[in-house]
Amino acid sequence: MADLLFEIGAEEIPAGFVPGALRQLEDDLAKALADARLAHGEVRAVGTPRRLAVWARDVAPKQTDARTEAFGPPVAQAYDAEGKPTPAATGFARSQGVEVSALVRAQTPKGERVAVTKVEKGRKAEQVLPALLERLVAGLRFRKAMRSRFDEVTFARPVRWMVALLGGRPLKVRHGEVASGKVTYGHRFLAPKAIALKGTPDDYLAKLRRAHVLADPEERRAALLAELARAGKEAGGKVRDDPALVEQVLYLVEEPSAVVGEFERSNLELPPEVVISEMRNHQRYFAVVDGKGRLKNRFVAVSATRVKDPAVARHGYERVLRARLADARFFFEEDRKRKLHERIEDLGRRTFQAKLGSELDRAQRIGAVASGLARALGKDALVADLLEASRLAKVDLNTGMVGEFPELQGTMGAHYARLEGLKPEIADAIEDHYKPIGAAEEMPRSDLGALVAVADRLHSLVGIIGVGEKATGAADPFGLRRAAIGILRIVIARGYHLSLATAVEQTLDALAGVKLAAGRALVAEQVLDFLRGRVRAAWTERFDADLVEAVLAAGSDDVVDARRRLEALAEAKARPDFGSLAVAFKRVANIQEKAGGPGAAAVDPALLRDPAEQDLLAALEKVEQEVGARRAARDYPAVLRTVATLEPAVARFFDDVLVMAEDPALRANRLGLMRRVGALFSDLADFRKIQAEAPAQARAG
């Protein structure tokens, strides 16, 4: 057994490319070794902006032998009456590269056939690995790649060196004009000389560590966090928590070194989001806060190189930030010369989407949709504030500050609203209507912000789909998936029992002046299909797919209600008796469909001849009363527990009673009984879609 070590050294790879490339290397090498029949131990990838490396411990010295069996014609066609090979047999043997005498008889599902078993002897690992590693590096995919001017190969950035060692012995691997060797290189400035490697992962990490390179991202993360903690303390506070920035900086440096800087205290008069955005998004600096979380006029920058005089680096970082903050102060002061209401008409000169008109049109439609949603939810008292918040929600798009810092849309509008003395809830709604942002958990703080947020996303979703633009495959230029997910997350988080179909119709009403690419009914169905697709995708990440399908089939117009039904069904499925319950209710649902679907049905007790059907009706009448009250309260776990008590009676009914009796009156009465049983659960879930079977004991009984 020997360790395999493979490293690709390159010019600075963009930070966002490195984590994905390391995952690819790990997955692809493990799969390639398995496909090559080379046994191995741990496979792990590590890397920095200048190198991607992967190793496999304890690689077998040679491939395992491969046995393959090929089947030919039936024996009756392969041999004549005297047992001599026919042309069919000789032709098959020739195609397999063997003598006819090597053919054997084998039983197959298609009868007895001639066959040949071939054994491919395993080759030595050092013979297999060079081509395998060349395919590995050629198979790496990046969002953008560069082509060398000297050859046709591509990579994220030009490849400068490679290392390929098996048990310390070099393997001959090429990528374009670069051939592999057994030396790597340390930090570009602090240890640029070649470093000979023994080929083990531990040796690789240790030698690079001495050369100012922490190749293992987790080791580098620990060092980075320690540096940030030290620097925050030096700055008289602590570094503001920012996991996303930590992740980014982690792949910008090979050995982190933190430097504390300072900016003018007067810049703390700017909204803190402006200062933080300037530091983190434009300069990759970490903000420093005091014990109460208030911003200090300090920052921490992470350098890729430890310099002899930190003051030189600090001065450079401060100079760049000083200029950026001066620009921000200028935009802030200019913006404040005009009130938000004075900027509303400016939205008419800003196009939202060519076929959907201006941002002013958009703002007016958002107000109409938000008002309709409020009325549908019984929140009529919010309508006046919703119209005001909707008018102002997009106004900051025309400010200098948002023009310079697009990520602060909504945030700046809220700050300006507070400074102008507008209602705090209006200011909050201006900021909150963009939430949730991506996968962030932060949601709108109030109904006002939530309803404007839902209305904004509904307008985009219905409008964009309505004019014929759709999300296809990976392409979603208008962010329709993000809009749909945002709608669903807000509605569920706020517990809004809202009809999606009604909300879409209200949005189409607001878009009355827009020329749709298809009929109104078709557009509405396309939007609802799109929303259902997002519901399905989101819920199948957490719940069994069959349960999701069962719940959606029973209705998804009210997603809050559907989510509660799904959670109750998942809880029920975890119980040991669920299999029997599901099987029984599947049979009920199938018969119910034959009887004309769910609904009230007359059952004549006088026609119930069999004790099993009489007992079922008695149990049913008791359960119907209990279920009615619990369904009204949307207590679906209790509904399912109550309905489950019917399972023994239903099972006995199916065992003892012929539903499709020859007597039409008996048959209709029994079908009516099934319809009443089905009505208890048909609006909760379609049990026919649930994958479950009765326990073996129940089936045997």
From Swiss-Prot:
SUPFAM superfamilies (UniProt xref): HD-domain/PDEase-like (SSF109604)
UniProt entry tagged with the keyword Ligase: yes
Top-level EC class as recorded in UniProt: ligase
One Pfam match: tRNA_synt_2f
GO biological processes: arginyl-tRNA aminoacylation; glycyl-tRNA aminoacylation
Record-linked SMART domains: DALR_1 (SM00836)
Reactions catalysed, as given in the entry: tRNA(Gly) + glycine + ATP = glycyl-tRNA(Gly) + AMP + diphosphate
Claim: Zinc is one of the keywords in the record: no
Cellular compartments annotated: Cytoplasm
A GO term for molecular function: arginine-tRNA ligase activity
Source taxon at top rank: Bacteria
Gene Ontology cellular component annotations, sorted alphabetically: cytosol
HAMAP family on file: Gly_tRNA_synth_beta
Record's subunit section: Tetramer of two alpha and two beta subunits.
Family under the similarity heading: Belongs to the class-II aminoacyl-tRNA synthetase family.
Name assigned to this protein: Glycine--tRNA ligase beta subunit
Organism: Anaeromyxobacter dehalogenans (strain 2CP-C)
Gene (name only): glyS
